[in-house]
Amino acid sequence: MPDTVIIGLVSTSDRASGGIYPDEGIPSLKAWLAKAVRNPVRFIEALVPDEQAEIEAELKKMADSDRCDLIFTTGGTGPAPRDVTPEATLNVVEKEMPGFGEQMRQISLYYVPTAILSRQTAGIRGKCLIVNLPGRPKAIAETLGGVRGEDGGIKVHGLFSAIPYCIDLIGGPFIETDETVSKAFRPQRK
């Protein structure tokens, strides 16, 4: 039986955390991951306001106490004054992984020119990969799954193609994926 993967989901939004409207980020992430990941998954969820200290505290708790293998944040990555998720992430990680943010912007630019305003990033804390995602459900699915052509073939790989191998490299569980959703790339060993 495959290893259980512990995934933290953090939605950062003043309005959703204040009950003004329902959060859409966490349900979208859970639905996408349920299709993509074949391992048993235990989700740990948090809805927090756009307060850097609160975001940092939640990321630390999930990585250190809850022992998450992977944490996704949604929202708070734009240029608005209250968008502080990247700053919170960079304050808690030990290694920045800038390729994730670069790839997210590349994917999103296929769909909207304002993707260039995104400040998404990623990094490693202990044995946990933390990745900032957009807040909108459609953008979450696009960045994780990538860009596909009319024939269904991959034009630009999504982030999730690299995540299982990254988790391998930092000592986490072996993540198996449904290749029709997101094929995990692992280099062949000679």
Where are these regions (language model features)?
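Non-catalytic beta/alpha edge segments that cap or flank active sites
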Residues: 1-190
